[in-house]
Amino acid sequence: MSKILVVLTGGTIGSVCSDGVRGINGDSPYILLREFSRRCPEYSECNFEVINPYSILSENLSYGCWEKLYSALSGIDTSTYSGIIITHGSDTLAYTSAIMGYLMRGTQCPIVFTAADRPVDDPESNAICNFRSAVEFIINSGLRGVFTAYRSYSVNAIHLATRLCSADCFLDEFTAYGGEIFGKTDKGRFVPNASPLNPSQSELKRDLTSIAPDKIHLSRKVMLLHSYPHMDYSAINPDGFAAVINCGYHCATACNSGGSLSLASFAEKCAACGADLWLGSFKSAENEVYASNDALLKLGIRQFTDMSWEAAYTKAVLAYNLPNTDADEFMQRNIYFEQVGKPLSD
């Protein structure tokens, strides 16, 4: 019998719709388990235990939610479970998947995030399909680590938690940074994707040490920016932030001319208030940079490489908040497969 811990946090997968408004009411997060038991009787022998550290629509996610979720997970002996499923809202799924991928990398069982495009009671919802995929992965993969299960583009995709990219706003489909999902579930089995960009199953079975104490306090803020044409940095105040992650264009470029439109002007503001400024995501395999970036990097702007902006942002949140952590060194390490095509740093 498989013993699976289900961690309910709300989101669309834990909501109901009333008069055209989706929300979390009473026991609505528990509807998922009742419907799964009804629709998937072949998994009746699974023993589900449930905890509910908080219930929110995930657009309301804050650092405090991450502190609560990690506190709940770090207090669990993961070796006593076949797996853990965390239900979450789809809006910020990529962020929580990534940060818990880092924090729970030493788990002794598979931890699988999942979500839904519509409430469980909607006939068009993929909630049961996604939850079932998470169960099938736990039972059949033989792996440990942190993952995300979500059906996208007609595939029951399994993602490495630190490589999940936010969903397309129109289709509600998720993708993987680097373009390769980790695998899929099909007919009740896990089918790995043997891409050279993915870690091997032996790598996933390595014993990894935890990077954090049992409790975390995320008191230092990190800002996330995205470059766009005519971005006016004079309107942005980095005061009070430990760091700023500036996601450049796809070549990791950002404007370096035009006064307040230049990232160089913002770098001066960041330096004046003690906020570290990061630009990326660079490709570490490339030895050449554009002239615009060469000028920016000579100003002392830091660079992050080979990872999504969700992974970079959440990594920075930990880099600037975990005790006894050198932020620069932490950002360059490959903590939990977030850096595509690179081996783990330890």
Give short role names for the model-derived ranges.
Residues 2-346:
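Active-site histidine-anchored catalytic micro-motif
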